[in-house]
Amino acid sequence: MKIKLIGNVMNYEIDAFGTLVIAVFFLFIGRYLVSKISFFRNYNLPEPVIGGLIAAITAFILYKFFNISATFDSEIQTILMLMFFTSVGLSADFTKLKEGGKSLLIFLVCVILFVVVQNAVGMSLATALGLDPLIGLIVGSVTLTGGHGTAGAWGEVLETQYGIQGAIVLGMASATFGLVIGGLVGGPVAKFLIKRNQLAETVAQETNEQQLDTSINTAPFEYPKKTRLITASNAVSTLGMFALCIFVANEMTEISQGRWFELPTFVWALGTGVIVRNFLEHVLKVDIFDRAIDVFGNASLSLYLSMALLSLQLWLLADLAGPLITILFAQTAVLILFTAIVTFRIMGKNYDAAVLVAGHCGFGMGATPTAIANIQAVTNSYGPSHKAFLIVPLCGAFFIDIVNAVVIQSIIAFFG
């Protein structure tokens, strides 16, 4: 651990192992608080989000009142993120994609509509408040649907090419807001819909997961706490597939840089996972051990979320001007109304639709890992939703980035 004085702030640089230890510590705190506080369980708040928020608030207090900050190792967080998206790809058997079929396409339509609405709200309010319309785009789908990675990439473009000063900082702050809100509103909105429409009865989590027949073909991230029996051989072969997919993803990111098919590394990881899975299974007739993929995927998901929130600099939100905070809260209200009215109705007004709403809230304001955590929290309380675990990871991790990139590029080209 290195210590540096930055201005009047003492900054501690935490290495990869220290970062992992702290992330696990706060993850367990989140798990403990959820188990002890009925409010968190009743509103289906994810354990990594609760633990990560405690960490972020602790960091905020240390920074504001004691002039102490910490810089955590970002490489291990990136690896965990790529492992999560790779697990989504490796779980995407083409037969499962066919199973998603019509529902996947309908949900994608909802997502596309919301991206357009989100940008319309952001840019309209920015104009009404006397700001550049492109600032409204930053507090629209660039950061709220796109997340921190998209915020950084487009922020640099808007600063250097379109003269939007502070676009990167604004983008990071807005993405931070979205990540927090996305993890907080999904569960409560889904609970409201379930209760109002009497869609499901609360079930005991232990009965739902531990007594489930392990032969049942479940979607990735479904039943995250179910006992999964794996061997060392299965673990090694699965780890090899993860390593291959992430290696190819990194290479494709370099090859595609500056070209028309340029995509974020995590999208390449997901896509490579889909190809590897289906090539091995349907061409080479290799048996894929899904339980090992599920274990790696769920572990990386929890740790990544904990680390992402651990690294949040909440004091950036304090620097947002009043008009921008107004836009962000308006976006939150629009998200809740859109998902509760449009997404829920279009997806069938049933239990699966309510769980899909929780997922849509997750990546509509935050990120795909938040969406998965949301639907895990809801299904832990009300029972399984195979459709949600099938649709949300694919739509949130793959299709949404392509849709968002096209929409953002079109708007910038028009207003630029």
For every predicted segment, state its role.
Residues 29-41, 87-99, 189, 276-290, ...:
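C-terminal ends of transmembrane helices
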Residues 93-123, 175, 239, 295, ...:
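Entry/N-cap segments of selected transmembrane alpha helices
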Residues 124-131, 175-219, 333, 341-351, ...:
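Juxtamembrane and boundary regions of transmembrane helices in multi-pass small-molecule transporters
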Residues 125-166, 170-173, 177, 189, ...:
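Alpha-helical membrane segments and immediately flanking helix-loop junctions
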